[in-house]
Amino acid sequence: GFFGGSHDVLVARRHWRDDAVDTTGLAGSATLSVTEHRVWTQWAVNAMHAQYLQNKHVKYVAVFQNWLRPAGASFDHLHKQVVGVDSLGASLQAEIARVNANGNIYRDFVDWAYRAGLVVAANDGAVALAGVGHRYPSLEVYSTGPVCEPWLMEPEQVDAVSDLVHALHQATGTQVPLNEEWHYRAPGVAKEMPWRVVLKWRVSTLAGFEGATKIYLKTIDPRSLRERVVRELEQLSASQAGALAPGIRLGDECGQPYLQYGRA
């Protein structure tokens, strides 16, 4: 850890895939097995919980994964960062204010995404969809369980989120720079906020227009992103037995999701 123990870096074992023959064969989240990705996710959950237990000044623990240098990675090796900070950021405070005004805001958004045809995949504990309103093309995974804090969830609930995140990484591949960001309810926040993971594809360059207008141009819209990812997952499921975790439903098979946060 760095900075007095409030910055942990989790480093994966492999740098190259076992079958790599050139420098394009980097080992990333997409090349992990289902079981390995579950362990990788639980390791990060344990690390974030440990920071809250070990440092009373930590108000929020940020968990993120920068994949490849264009996405901010210091080195092209699979790693997660777990960083404890002593205050809630402005963005999180604004989100909490919106939640205080409407406790159903996350359900409302997921319901809207379903009606808009943006659901990518689902299982019995989570739902994945094409995100809206991000600076980059993005995919989101929401836990549909009743518990908000990842470290308080049953292992199978964490696995449900992990399995969909893993599937989205596989659909993305290892050649696309991306940021994986975790969002959840911080300790001390009264209103329920479900755990969600956002994958942002860093495939566009922000320039003067975006800075001047705060209008962010993207090369792929949410519906096209959804169609592309569903197609990749369907092909993967058909061609590689066991590549996706059991119980994952794709595209129109998913049905309408329901977030149970606040129902514990």
Language-model region placement:
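HIT superfamily nucleotide-processing domains
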Residues: 1-264
